[in-house]
């Protein structure tokens, strides 16, 4: 790699690094704006302990953590939807939703739309209840870890095959 390439790579790292700091600074500012608007820094907010943080700390495995994170993200989307008419904090909420979109949904709009559609389904609707029960066995099949067993068996077979060929 030539000297010029090193300089260009270094400049690119600086630009990308400063952009990340800028985004994080903006996100921090918007979060602080929401806290101030909702008076979330007062002492009574601490009563009863944290709402989500202890739960997040208890769930260590990535797949388990994703389940909890999805419930928490769902809560925040409902919260933002509840506060959508408050013009003073609208920009802050949009910035935070954008950050959630990037971090949780990997910037995939279809995933986010599907997620939001799921959170809007009314459990009180009798037709929805009937549809959900009708689909229950299929959903349970999706939830079962069968696909992991197939992958594990396939990799074990490949591993055994390689080991056998060595001897």
Swiss-Prot record:
Q: Which GO biological process entries does UniProt record here? A: adaptive immune response; defense response to virus; humoral immune response; positive regulation of autophagy
**Post-translational modification Pyrrolidone carboxylic acid, affected residues:** 24
Q: Output the Gene Ontology terms for molecular function.
A: cytokine activity; type II interferon receptor binding
Where is the protein found, in the record's own terms? Secreted
User: Quick one: signal sequence residues?
Assistant: 1-23
Alphabetical list of Pfam families matching this protein: IFN-gamma
Q: For this UniProt entry, what is the primary localization, expressed as one broad class?
A: secreted
Q: Name one GO cellular component term.
A: extracellular space
Q: Which residues are glycosylated?
A: 41, 108, 117
Q: Which InterPro entries match?
A: 4_helix_cytokine-like_core, Interferon_gamma
Write down the superkingdom of origin: Eukaryota
User: How would you summarize the oligomeric state and partners of this protein?
Assistant: Homodimer. Interacts with IFNGR1 (via extracellular domain); this interaction promotes IFNGR1 dimerization.
The protein's job, in short, is: Type II interferon produced by immune cells such as T-cells and NK cells that plays crucial roles in antimicrobial, antiviral, and antitumor responses by activating effector immune cells and enhancing antigen presentation. Primarily signals through the JAK-STAT pathway after interaction with its receptor IFNGR1 to affect gene regulation. Upon IFNG binding, IFNGR1 intracellular domain opens out to allow association of downstream signaling components JAK2, JAK1 and STAT1, leading to STAT1 activation, nuclear translocation and transcription of IFNG-regulated genes.
Family annotation (PANTHER family): INTERFERON GAMMA
Q: What is this protein called?
A: Interferon gamma
Q: Which gene encodes it?
A: IFNG
